[in-house]
């Protein structure tokens, strides 16, 4: 979309390290995703080796979501994810986990929540994180009965609203895994 290009093109022009590929809605081209996203517009950040870390934003990153998007770019460029070694080890020893973070652009705490969930996906192939901007995708808000944001969905079966810190998210995921195993 033109609105997405308005956000992304200045970033691409600002650094030769950023390359942008666009997927048109009716295209069979994957634009580097490795798959065709189920919702467009979508942004996947892929590292310089072409590796997809399982992080995608559905919608146009504006306001607070733009800050989270910029932090994703910094995470990719520096490799810094703000998780200590013990936490990374625990994340890598978990079952595969899919995180969906549902946000609106200007709601406080959404960008921090996105950054934490993204850091889990960045440091482990066992975690994916999709972020959906609900103003652009009201059908997703309806499907998950979202009344407040941020709302995080873990593997489609655990849904909780509000922000969290890194250790709290890890605890929630570990408890969900142990509940499923029992």
Where are these regions (language model features)?
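Oxidative protein folding and maturation machinery
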Residues: 1-31, 40-42
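Local sequence-structure signature of Cys/Sec-based thiol-disulfide redox active-site neighborhoods
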Residues: 1-14, 91-125
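Thiol-based oxidoreductase modules, predominantly thioredoxin-like and allied folds used
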Residues: 15-28, 125-139
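Generic beta-strand/beta-sheet core signal
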Residues: 23, 102-104, 132, 155
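Structural micro-motif
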Residues: 29-53, 143-155
